[in-house]
Amino acid sequence: MAVPKRRVSKTRAAKRRSHYKIALAKPIKDKDGSWKMPHHINKFTGSYK
């Protein structure tokens, strides 16, 4: 089992974790031409995409 040779500082750990981001969902164009967020129901047409 691997064991750390020396302690990782808070700053170094934070710099490494700065890339662990969730990408924001981009709106998509619906069949009727309106923009909406993915995986949401359109109130007017009732479509789910």
From Swiss-Prot:
The protein, known as: Large ribosomal subunit protein bL32
Q: Which UniProt keywords apply?
A: Ribonucleoprotein, Ribosomal protein
Organism domain of life? Bacteria
One GO location term (cellular component): large ribosomal subunit
Family statement drawn from the similarity comment of this UniProt entry:
Belongs to the bacterial ribosomal protein bL32 family.
Which terms does the UniProt entry file under GO BP? Answer: translation
Q: Which organism is it from?
A: Helicobacter hepaticus (strain ATCC 51449 / 3B1)
**GO MF entries:** structural constituent of ribosome
Keyword Transmembrane among record annotations: no
Gene behind this chain?
rpmF
